[in-house]
Curated annotation (Swiss-Prot):
This is Small ribosomal subunit protein uS11c. It comes from Calycanthus floridus var. glaucus. Belongs to the universal ribosomal protein uS11 family. It is found in: Plastid, Chloroplast. Part of the 30S ribosomal subunit. Its main location: plastid. The keyword Nucleotidyltransferase does not apply. One of its GO terms (cellular component) is ribonucleoprotein complex. The lineage of its organism: Eukaryota, Viridiplantae, Streptophyta, Embryophyta, Tracheophyta. Residues 1-21 are annotated as: Disordered. Keywords: Chloroplast, Plastid, Ribonucleoprotein, Ribosomal protein, RNA-binding, rRNA-binding. Residues 9-21 have a biased composition (Basic residues). NCBIfam families: PRK05309.1 (NF003698), uS11_bact (TIGR03632). It comes from the Eukaryota. One of its GO terms (molecular function) is rRNA binding.
Length: 138
């Protein structure tokens, strides 16, 4: 009878959770991009590496419902839920875009319990750059 050879690369004694979740992030930056059609919430650490993200589309909203304030609130809550588990306590918020979800996303971030050091509007404003598209005639 032969002896069984122990497998070196077996996962029996190893950890099952991914290494990404084990990272502790005490401070981060929450980027909210609110367009008229969708709202994207991205959470990064202070160096700029993406930790978590969510959008109204990934939360299950389709079509015109993606641009609603409720969809933005849901997207912000989804993105923040994962980083709170990783130990985030303080954050800075950068809001970009003219969409309806700006205020709703900020409200959801405030309700989450993360201390906000500042909220900054980083919407790009042209200094009379490109010619805008013609007005719609409906």
């Amino acid at each position: 009878m032969t002896k069984s050879i122990p497998r070196i690369g077996s996962r029996r004694g190893g950890r099952i959770a991914s290494r990404k979740n084990a990272r502790r992030i005490p401070k981060g930056v929450i980027h909210v991009q609110a367009s008229f059609n969708n709202t994207i919430v991205t959470v990064t650490d202070v160096t700029g590496r993406v930790v978590s993200w969510s959008s109204a589309g990934t939360c299950g909203f389709r079509g015109t419902r993606r641009g609603t304030p409720f969809a933005a609130q849901t997207a912000a809550a989804n993105a923040i839920r994962t980083v709170i588990d990783q130990g985030m306590q303080r954050a800075e918020v950068m809001i970009k875009g003219p969409g309806l979800g700006r205020d709703a996303a900020l409200r959801a971030i405030r309700r989450s319990g993360i201390l906000l050091s500042f909220v900054r509007d980083v919407t790009p404003m042209p200094h009379n750059g490109c010619r805008p598209p013609k007005k719609r005639r409906v």
